[in-house]
Amino acid sequence: MQFKRLSDLIARNELKGKRVFIRADLNVPQDGKGNITEDTRIRASVPAIRQALQAGAAVMVTSHLGRPVEGEFKPADTLAPIAQRLSELLGQPVALKQDWVDGVDVAPGQVVLLENCRVNKGEKKNDDVLAKKIAALCDVYVNDAFGTAHRAEATTHGIAKYATVACAGPLLAAELDALGKALHQPASPLVAIVAGSKVSTKLTILKTLADKVDNLIVGGGIANTFMLAAGLKIGKSLAEADLVGDARAIMDMMAKRGASVPIPVDVVCAKEFSPTAIATVKDVADVTDDDMILDIGPKTADILAKQISQAGTIVWNGPVGVFEFDQFANGTKTLAHAIAESSGFSVAGGGDTLAAIAKYDIADKIGYISTGGGAFLEFLEGKTLPAVEILEQRATS
């Protein structure tokens, strides 16, 4: 992928005295009183802001927060708590500016936070008139919000069409570099772990990866559907019988080119889905009609861990069992530690995956952890991300 980078502009001393507009992803969780409960995204946005300030730029930053109604600003929509947290992290004042579309006063070395961009009429529809107005505020546009890269909106796409210079910030660039390395130039063997409750929500990803990977490890309800496709009984486990044909087609397609979808040889079952359910390990042939499969078994986990240990590249999206309940967590824990200990390059993403990484304290052992939920999945699906595509177009025009 070819796109301009903020770091390149800084290296060429092209930001001094310039007005820089940064689209960040500051959409953080808050409690009922508006207090920020988790600030990872704010901390992740700091390098781009700090780099632009140190390069002598006048910096404007904006983000969406929640789902405001366009044209109707409410107190719950405000970025005020984020301005305060940014100020603490940067060690300098961060003023919050409302009604900013028609003009912003900011001097070199200063940073202002522009109020929730999704309150502006036309933001979500990528309105051209709005995009041109916002582009006129700056000399350089920086997209540093991978989490919204799959959306074509005025501050993610439209502005990039019209700004004098449009580039990727360090967070977006690192994300694209890592995902490109994993999917476009992977060291082999390439192993993907795709897990979740439904095949239907990840069918496109499964089909796309089936063309590329050497081993496609499936988990959760997705694995149950593949077990049905392999002719195994799954009791009363969550599965999608109408997608058994698709699962079988994916298995056949991969087998033809010498790749595989490893089907579990043993599973962890229970009679009910609850935190206190009694877990029983069974060979797959012994699953009964009243069993619910809630994790892969230890033999399966060891087989898969060995495949992961030999991988050159690993893409991880989803825990393979109900890891929130400890008695059904061994599969996810075993694979998580195998990924952490592998010498291969690993990329992980998706909310449940991030929770598993946190639970097993392996964040520093994953090659790259993706910050974008929907954008990460669409990248895995092979879809074009509008906010990235426009940066590529601008780089070549």
Curated annotation (Swiss-Prot):
What InterPro entries does this protein's entry cite?
Phosphoglycerate_kinase, Phosphoglycerate_kinase_CS, Phosphoglycerate_kinase_N, Phosphoglycerate_kinase_sf
Per the UniProt record, one Pfam family is PGK
Could you provide one GO biological process annotation from this protein's UniProt record? glycolytic process
Cite the entry's keywords alphabetically. ATP-binding, Cytoplasm, Glycolysis, Kinase, Nucleotide-binding, Transferase
Q: Where in the cell is it found?
A: Cytoplasm
Ribosomal protein in keyword set: no
Q: What does the entry list as the binding residues for ATP?
A: K202, E324, G350, G351, D352, T353
GO MF term (any one):
ATP binding
User: Per UniProt, where does substrate bind?
Assistant: D25, L26, N27, R41, H64, L65, G66, R67, R118, R151
* Swiss-Prot/TrEMBL catalytic activity: (2R)-3-phosphoglycerate + ATP = (2R)-3-phospho-glyceroyl phosphate + ADP
The EC number of this protein is 2.7.2.3
One GO cellular component this record assigns the protein to is: cytosol
Kindly tell me the pathway this chain contributes to: Carbohydrate degradation; glycolysis; pyruvate from D-glyceraldehyde 3-phosphate: step 2/5
Cited HAMAP family: Phosphoglyc_kinase
As for family, the record states: Belongs to the phosphoglycerate kinase family.
Recorded hits in PANTHER family, A to Z, give: PHOSPHOGLYCERATE KINASE, PHOSPHOGLYCERATE KINASE 1, CHLOROPLASTIC-RELATED
Q: How does it assemble?
A: Monomer.
Protein's name according to its UniProt entry: Phosphoglycerate kinase
